[in-house]
Amino acid sequence: MRAMIDANGDAARTSGARIVHACGHDSIPSDLGVQFLQEAAIGRFGVPCRRVTTRITRMKGGFSGGTAATFLNAMKLRKEDPGFDTVSGDPYALCPAGDRDGPEGPDRMMPVSVTWDADLEAWTKPYFMASVNAKVVRRSNALMGYPWGRNFRYDETALTRGGVGGWWADMRYALFGRGLLIAMAIPVTQRLLIRHVLPKSGEGPPAQLRETGVYEVIQVGELPDGTILKAKVTGQGDPGVEPTTRMLTEAALCLAQDESRMKVGGGFWTPASAFAALLRDRITAHAGLSFELNEAGGVRVVPTGPRSGRADEDGVKQAAGAATVPPAP
């Protein structure tokens, strides 16, 4: 993404072309989910959450050949590009030039770390796509003019359970994930994995698993006064297959059919900065996703509505509860 933005960003802005990255399972639940939670916080309390954590609480799906090919390509790029590790480890690598700093520490794809989540009272383990999703969320905040503040913090992991059993299960997963990455980086073991373990390009999970797959994420936001707000994003189907296809389709239709209601001009965008409620409403209606706000006494769906207006890539300014948008270039 960083390479594409650097190479073609000026041309996209000049031509008016809108290119939106990360419109599948990575990173729509994270990106649009955080935006949904922050809009609820601003609407209810007048201020955004200073910190949001995303916890993957359910994930049932298979491992496809396309996913394997993506990891193998990342290993290849790491060898060929001396700056690859620097970019992948920089939590603000996808933010516009001049905005690539903040309070977060380095991103790591699969750290050997298990942490306790005091908000949800359970152990968490590394989630292998978290470093990408987190960069997209931070880029959204920057592109929209920092509606969540320049000191906004974001963290994403997978959630299991409490107790010693939960800690041990998470630690085994973390060690296995780290070991797999090391094995994929060594030529001999990489060849063995490709030949005997990893699915081939075009291969994927069986139909039954694709249809019965499910995923759920809980997002916890902390306001400046310590108030906690929680939201939930759920979806049906293997997240990397049919739901991703539906999300990509709805994103394309949003670009084609909702142009007059989009508030951005040409450039490279994220789902939240380009589409916001327009895409949330589409994928809720047609892609099997739901965005829910957890409240005392139950969970209720918060309706979202379309927005209007346009701006250039670096010009969207959003204050608490309202957006001020300069004219399109």
Label every model-predicted segment.
Residues 1-17:
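Rossmann-fold NAD(P)-binding glycine/threonine-rich loop
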Residues 13-18, 27-28, 35-329:
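C-terminal catalytic/substrate-binding lobe primarily of soluble NAD(P)-dependent oxidoreductases
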Residues 2-4, 26-33:
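Short glycine/serine/threonine-rich phosphate/pyrophosphate-binding segments
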